[in-house]
C-alpha cells in the first residue's frame, strides 16, 4: 500500500550514530518530529536540536521550508540555529586568534541560511563582526573571514546598508587604500564598498571622496582577476552615483590615466577568459561614456550663438576656398551672403539657413560635432566627399550634411546613446576601448561607407531613405560581429557591399518564395508534427544538460550562481548553489528537487514575481525579457522558482523545454526559426527528384463523373 501523499521517506544522520530511516509526516509539527528523532538516539532536550539538509549549503529545516523535503532526502541532526548562533558569538569574544578564525569559518559557512542569519543578527552579530573589522588587529585571514561573514549576513536584506556607521565605512576604505594588504581582503572590501555606494547616496559620497580614482586604477593593474573585477565594480558604481558634471570629470581623468588602453590590452585581450561580471561592468562603463554625448544630442543649434555660427563657417571653409579672400575683399555683403548660401547648399544642407537643419533632436549639436571632427581629422576625405558630390550630375549628389545628420541619429540608436544602463546586459563592444573618441571615429568610417554605398546604388535624392536602410543594415550586421578594432570594423563593413546586401536579401526572398506554392505548403504541414517532436526532444535534452543561472539580490546585483537541470527520466528538476568558477555539479550533488508533477504553470516577463514590482522603466526591459518563473505547489500555498536567463537564446531554450515538459505549446521565436529551418531542409530533400520540374500552383483538375453508374461485372472470367 502506497504511503499517504504527505508522508515522505527520508534518512536522518548524526555524527557517531547509526542513521535513521524514517517516514516523515508533513502534517505533524516539526517539534514533534524532532522529539521522535532525539528519542530514537536517547537525546534529551530536543529543543536544542534542529534538522538540516545534509548536502548543499546545509539549510536549516523550518515550518516554512519543510515542504522542500522530498522522498529520498538526507537530513542531519545538528545544533539548533539559535543555540548555534549563541555559541559561535560567545566563542568569538573569548578565544584566541586561531579560535576566532575557526568561529568565523563556521559563520561564513552558515550565514547564507536565512534562519541562522536572523539569529546571528538578533544577537548583535553584525556589531561584533564590525568590531573585528574596525579593530583590524589581524590584516590577514581573520579580517578576510570577518568581511566575508559580514557580507553574507548583509546580503539577506534584513539590515539596511544605510545603517552602517561612518567610522566603519572609513575603516573599510582604509583597507582599500592600503598598499601592503592580504590579497583576500581587498576584493571583499571593494565588494562591501560597492554595496554601500549602490544602496546609500550619503555613504556613497563618503566613498567617492575618500577612495581616489588612482587607487582603483592601481587595483585594476594587479594581475588578479577577482581584484580587477571588484575594482571595476566599485568604479562603475561610483560613476553611476555621480552627477553628470562629476561623471564627465571622473571619466576625463580616467582616460588621461590610460584606463582605456589598459582595459583593451590587459582585460579584453587577456589570456584568462573574461567573466560575466566583468563583461557587465565594461558594458556599463561603455554606456556611461557614451552617455556623455547625450546633452549634445538633445540640444538643437542656437542660431544666436556666435560660437556655433563660427563652427558652421569653419565647416564651410574647410571644404571650399573662401571666394571672397581669393578675389579680394571687394565683394558686397549681399554677394558674400549669396556665396555662403550656395556653398552650404553644396555641403548638403536642405535649408538656406543651415541652423534649421540642426534644430532636429536627436541628433542636435552632436551631428555638427561629428561633421567638424571629420573635417579636422580626415581633411582629405572630407574635401573629396564634398567636392566629388558637388560636381556630380544634378540629383545624383550625396548630400553630406543631410547624410551626417541622419547617420548620427542612426549611430545613436544603434549604440543606445542616452538610454539607461541595463542591469543584466553584457554586450559591450571591444572596439569602443580600442580607440579614443570612438563615437566620432565610428562616424568617420560610417560617412565614407554611406558615400560608397550611394555610388554603388547609383542613388538620387529620392533614394535617400533607401540608402539609409542599406547603411543601417551594413552597420548593424557588422557591429553584431563585435570587431575588436576600428580597422577591423572598417574592413568588415566595407566588405559588406550593396551587392552583398542584395544577395542576402535575394537569398532570403527565394527561401520564402520557395515555400509558398500550395503543394509545398501541404507537404510542410504534414512534416510539422514530426519536426516539432524533434525540436521538443532537443529542448528536453538541453534541460537535462543543465545550466548555470545568476541570482539577483535585493539590489538587483547578480553575484551568485546556481545550477538547475532536469533528471534523465524527465520527472524532477534538481538545483542548488555553486561557487563562481566551479565546474557544473553532478546530478547527485544537487541538494534541491522539484517534482515536475508539482509544477502549476510557467510564468514569463512581467508576470514573474521577482521582477513584477521593479517598475516599468527602460532599465528593466532587458530584465523582463530574460526572466521566467515556475510556480509549484508548496503545501497549501503557491511557491516560485525564479530564473534570469544568461541570454535571450538560453531564455528561449529553457522556456520551450519547460513548456514541452508541461505539455504546453512551444511558442518562442527560436522554435519558430528552428522549425522553419528544419522544414526548409526536409522539403528540399523531398523535392530533390523534382529539380527543374515546375510545380503547378493548383493540383490537376478532377475529371467529371461518368454519365451513369451502371457498372457490369463479367462472371465468366475465372479468377486465378
UniProtKB/Swiss-Prot annotation:
Keyword Membrane listed? The answer is: no
Q: What is this protein called?
A: Engulfment and cell motility protein 3
Q: Does the keyword Repressor apply?
A: no
Q: Which residues cross the membrane?
A: none
Alphabetized Pfam families for the sequence? ELMO_ARM, ELMO_CED12, PH_12
Domain ELMO, which positions? Answer: 307-479
- Annotated GO MF terms: SH3 domain binding
**What's a single GO CC term here?**
cytoplasm
What InterPro entries is this protein classified in?
ARM-like (IPR011989), ARM-type_fold (IPR016024), ELMO_ARM (IPR024574), ELMO_dom (IPR006816), ELMO_domain-containing (IPR050868), PH-like_dom_sf (IPR011993), PH_domain (IPR001849)
Which superkingdom heads the taxonomic lineage of this protein's source? Eukaryota
Assembly and partners?
Probably interacts directly with the SH3-domain of DOCK1 via its SH3-binding site. Part of a complex with DOCK1 and RAC1. Interacts with ADGRB3.
Main localization is cytoplasm
The UniProt annotation puts motif SH3-binding at 696-706
Protein keywords:
Apoptosis, Cytoplasm, Phagocytosis, SH3-binding
The task this protein performs is described as:
Involved in cytoskeletal rearrangements required for phagocytosis of apoptotic cells and cell motility. Acts in association with DOCK1 and CRK. Was initially proposed to be required in complex with DOCK1 to activate Rac Rho small GTPases. May enhance the guanine nucleotide exchange factor (GEF) activity of DOCK1.
* Compartment list: Cytoplasm
Extract one GO BP annotation from the record: phagocytosis
Amino acid at each position: 500500500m502506497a504511503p499517504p501523499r504527505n508522508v515522505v521517506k527520508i534518512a536522518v544522520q548524526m555524527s557517531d550514530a547509526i542513521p535513521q530511516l524514517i517516514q516523515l509526516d508533513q502534517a505533524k509539527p516539526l517539534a514533534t518530529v524532532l522529539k521522535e528523532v532525539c528519542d530514537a538516539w536517547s537525546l534529551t532536550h530536543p529543543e536544542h536540536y534542529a534538522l538540516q539538509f545534509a548536502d548543499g549549503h546545509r539549510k536549516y529545516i523550518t515550518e516554512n521550508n519543510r515542504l522542500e523535503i522530498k522522498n529520498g532526502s538526507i537530513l542531519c541532526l545538528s545544533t539548533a540555529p539559535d543555540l548555534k548562533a549563541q555559541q559561535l558569538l560567545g566563542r568569538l569574544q573569548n578565544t584566541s586568534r586561531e579560535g576566532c578564525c575557526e568561529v568565523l569559518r563556521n559563520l561564513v559557512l552558515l550565514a547564507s541560511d536565512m534562519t541562522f542569519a536572523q539569529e546571528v543578527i538578533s544577537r548583535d552579530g553584525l556589531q561584533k563582526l564590525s568590531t573585528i573589522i574596525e579593530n583590524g588587529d589581524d590584516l590577514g585571514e581573520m579580517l578576510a573571514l570577518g568581511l566575508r561573514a559580514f557580507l553574507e549576513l548583509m546580503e539577506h536584506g534584513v539590515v539596511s546598508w544605510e545603517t552602517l556607521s561612518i567610522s566603519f565605512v572609513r575603516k573599510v576604505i582604509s583597507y582599500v587604500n592600503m598598499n601592503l594588504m592580504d590579497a583576500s581582503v581587498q576584493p571583499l572590501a571593494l565588494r562591501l564598498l560597492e554595496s554601500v555606494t549602490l544602496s546609500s547616496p550619503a555613504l556613497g559620497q563618503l566613498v567617492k571622496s575618500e577612495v581616489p580614482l588612482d587607487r582603483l586604477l592601481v587595483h585594476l593593474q594587479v594581475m588578479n582577476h577577482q581584484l580587477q573585477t571588484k575594482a571595476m565594480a566599485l568604479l562603475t558604481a561610483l560613476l553611476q552615483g555621480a552627477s553628470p558634471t562629476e561623471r564627465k570629470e571622473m571619466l576625463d581623468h580616467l582616460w588621461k590615466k590610460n584606463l582605456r588602453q589598459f582595459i583593451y590590452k590587459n582585460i579584453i585581450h587577456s589570456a584568462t577568459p573574461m567573466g560575466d561580471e566583468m563583461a557587465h561592468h565594461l558594458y556599463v562603463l561603455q554606456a556611461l561614456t557614451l552617455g556623455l554625448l547625450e546633452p549634445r544630442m538633445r540640444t538643437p543649434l542656437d542660431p544666436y550663438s556666435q560660437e556655433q555660427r563660427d563652427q558652421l563657417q569653419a565647416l564651410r571653409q574647410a571644404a571650399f576656398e573662401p571666394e571672397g579672400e581669393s578675389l579680394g575683399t571687394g565683394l558686397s555683403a549681399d554677394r558674400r551672403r549669396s556665396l555662403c548660401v550656395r556653398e552650404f547648399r553644396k555641403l548638403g544642407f536642405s535649408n538656406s539657413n543651415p541652423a534649421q537643419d540642426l534644430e532636429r533632436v536627436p541628433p542636435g549639436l552632436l551631428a555638427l560635432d561629428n561633421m567638424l571632427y571629420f573635417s579636422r581629422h580626415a581633411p582629405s576625405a572630407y574635401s573629396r566627399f564634398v567636392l566629388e558630390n558637388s560636381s556630380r550630375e544634378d540629383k545624383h549628389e550625396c548630400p553630406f550634411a543631410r547624410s551626417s545628420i541622419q547617420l548620427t541619429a542612426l549611430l545613436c540608436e544603434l549604440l543606445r546613446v542616452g538610454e539607461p544602463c541595463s542591469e543584466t546586459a553584457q554586450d559591450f563592444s571591444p572596439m569602443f576601448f580600442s580607440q579614443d573618441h570612438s563615437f566620432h571615429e565610428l562616424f568617420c568610417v560610417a560617412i565614407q561607407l554611406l558615400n560608397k554605398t550611394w555610388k554603388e546604388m547609383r542613388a538620387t535624392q529620392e533614394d535617400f531613405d533607401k540608402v539609409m536602410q542599406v547603411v543601417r543594415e551594413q552597420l548593424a550586421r557588422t557591429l553584431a560581429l563585435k570587431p575588436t578594432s576600428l580597422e577591423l570594423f572598417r574592413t568588415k563593413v566595407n566588405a559588406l557591399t550593396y551587392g552583398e546586401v542584395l544577395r542576402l536579401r535575394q537569398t532570403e526572398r527565394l527561401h520564402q518564395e520557395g515555400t509558398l506554392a500550395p503543394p509545398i505548403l501541404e507537404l510542410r504541414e504534414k512534416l510539422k508534427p514530426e519536426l516539432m517532436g524533434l525540436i521538443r526532444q532537443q529542448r528536453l535534452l538541453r534541460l537535462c544538460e543543465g545550466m548555470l543561472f545568476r541570482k539577483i539580490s535585493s539590489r538587483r546585483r547578480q553575484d551568485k550562481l546556481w545550477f538547475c537541470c532536469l533528471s534523465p527520466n524527465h520527472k524532477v528538476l534538481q538545483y542548488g548553489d555553486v561557487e563562481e568558477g566551479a565546474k557544473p555539479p553532478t546530478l547527485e550533488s544537487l541538494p534541491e528537487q522539484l517534482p515536475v508533477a508539482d509544477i502549476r504553470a510557467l510564468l514569463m516577463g512581467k508576470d514573474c514575481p521577482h521582477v513584477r514590482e521593479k517598475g516599468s522603466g527602460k532599465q528593466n526591459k532587458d530584465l523582463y525579457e530574460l526572466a521566467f518563473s515556475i510556480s509549484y505547489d508548496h503545501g497549501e500555498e503557491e511557491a516560485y522558482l525564479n530564473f534570469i536567463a544568461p541570454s535571450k537564446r538560453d531564455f528561449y531554450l529553457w522556456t520551450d523545454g519547460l513548456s514541452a515538459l508541461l505539455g504546453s505549446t512551444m511558442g518562442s521565436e527560436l522554435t519558430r526559426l528552428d522549425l522553419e529551418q528544419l522544414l526548409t531542409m526536409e522539403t528540399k530533400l523531398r523535392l530533390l527528384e523534382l529539380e527543374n520540374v515546375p510545380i503547378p500552383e493548383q493540383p490537376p483538375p478532377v475529371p467529371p463523373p461518368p454519365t451513369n453508374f451502371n457498372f457490369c461485372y463479367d462472371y465468366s472470367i475465372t479468377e486465378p
